[in-house]
A protein has these predicted regions:
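C-terminal tail/sorting-segment detector
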Residues: 235-246
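Helix-loop-strand module that forms the ligand-binding subsite of alpha/beta enzymes
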Residues: 80-170
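N-terminal beta1-alpha1-beta2 submodule of the flavodoxin-like/Rossmannoid cofactor-binding fold
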Residues: 22-117, 126, 193, 197
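Glycine-rich phosphate/pyrophosphate-binding loop and the adjoining helix
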Residues: 172-205
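Bacterial Sec-dependent N-terminal signal peptides
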Residues: 1-25
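Solvent-exposed loop/turn segments at secondary-structure junctions
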Residues: 43-46, 67-71, 121-125, 152-156, ...
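Residue-level detector of functionally pivotal "anchor" positions at catalytic/ligand-binding pockets or at interdomain
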Residues: 17-18, 202-224
Length: 246
């Protein structure tokens, strides 16, 4: 009995840590997020690494956007080709022919309530390939809850955010976009873990509209960090700090 009490005391102290609070919030996304699709384009592999980190923390399907013309080197000659594609979009942003062709999308976007965009930054703008996807699917994406993660070398992401808002005027933004650059790319797991609770994703459970604020109320959690069922024993967390056994 003494050993059991010591074990439970140690467990309670662990649950009081800020890291555990963040993980509890993230676990609630896994349990309560509505059906989610991660849409990404990755030229150098950085965005793919970000998607892998994101997918390890939430339950979501993935859709990789690919250019129709293969083998192009967008970075050659100081991104001359990439700049050319971006300039064509700038000149006529409402003309479908201004956007580079992409492979057909076979996923049914109608099946998803949450969309998470993961895109590279080219010369302070959204990569042209991702712009094509958003332009072509702006009607299907209308009414969705959308979040975004931007990969860049060092530039700020405000230009990419502006492109996204122009291309998707009728979506609900879940929150601020997350920028991940060369200096913090290796810390992407923790960056994403801290970012997720700041997003107001569409929930499959009507009783929970915002996981972050809900966690701060008195709730009973199992040892796995999920909400306990009625009558199920677990750990009571109140105001994110006070803990008891029920």
């Amino acid at each position: 009995m003494r050993l059991f009490l010591l074990f439970m005391t140690a467990l309670l102290l662990t649950c009081c840590s800020s890291d555990s609070e963040v993980k509890a919030e993230t676990n609630q996304y896994q349990a309560h997020m509505a059906k989610t699709l991660i849409v990404y384009y990755s030229y150098t592999g950085n965005c793919k690494a970000i998607v892998n980190s994101l997918a390890s923390q939430i339950t979501a399907d993935q859709l990789e956007i690919q250019p129709a013309e293969k083998g192009l080197r967008y970075e050659a000659n100081n991104y001359a080709l990439g700049t050319q594609l971006l300039n064509a979009i700038k000149a006529n942003p409402n003309d479908a022919s201004s956007y580079p062709a992409i492979d057909p999308v076979t996923v049914s976007i109608d099946d998803y309530q949450n969309i998470i965009i993961v895109t590279p930054l080219w010369w302070s703008q959204m990569a042209a390939i991702m712009q094509t996807f958003l332009f072509q699917n702006r009607t299907k994406l209308a009414g969705k809850t959308v979040a975004m993660i931007v990969s860049s070398h060092s530039s700020g992401i405000s230009g990419v955010v502006a492109d996204a808002q122009r291309l998707l005027p009728n979506v609900t933004w879940a929150g601020d976009a997350l920028g991940i650059n060369a200096s913090n790319h290796s810390n992407r797991n923790s960056l994403i873990e801290n970012w997720l609770p700041t997003q107001n994703f569409h929930s499959s459970t009507t009783g929970i509209s915002h996981v972050k604020s809900d966690v701060k109320k008195s709730k009973v959690y199992t040892l796995q960090g999920t909400l306990a069922l009625v009558g199920q024993k677990g750990i009571v967390i109140k105001d994110g700090k006070k803990v008891a056994i029920k």
